[in-house]
């Protein structure tokens, strides 16, 4: 499968959790030691901190959240993707994600940096 499509599948799973208000599900697409940097709050280091940040975000509701992977690439077990996100008519931005493939062959996010438009 094309790597960009693999990334989109991972992001689609994340969006599904987000729309349901499932912060733990959102955090599950990240590595346990992942780092997330966002203009919407302080840096979140580790899956627990990422889940805590998402608890606040999903409580605000996001039935219309969309994320589209616009480019992606990989070399061996290391990959990246750039995605555009939107939640409604006012909130939008980009994310740069570094992904690693685990021993099980599954890709997860190890580093994420969000930028608001």
PLM feature segments, named:
Residues 1-32, 48:
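Short, low-complexity N-terminal intrinsically disordered segments enriched in polar/charged residues
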Residues 32, 77-79, 104-105:
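Beta-strand-connecting loop/turn residues
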């Amino acid at each position: 499968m094309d790597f960009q499509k693999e990334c989109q599948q991972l992001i689609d799973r994340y969006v599904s959790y987000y729309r349901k208000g499932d912060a733990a599900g959102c955090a599950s697409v990240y590595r346990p030691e992942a780092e997330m940097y966002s203009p919407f709050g302080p840096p979140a280091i580790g899956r627990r901190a990422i889940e805590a940040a998402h608890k606040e975000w999903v409580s605000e509701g996001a039935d219309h959240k969309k994320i589209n992977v616009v480019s992606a690439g990989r070399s061996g077990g290391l990959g990246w993707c750039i995605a555009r996100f939107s939640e409604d008519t006012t909130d939008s931005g980009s994310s740069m994600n570094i992904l690693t493939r685990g021993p099980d062959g599954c890709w997860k996010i190890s580093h994420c940096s969000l930028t608001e438009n």
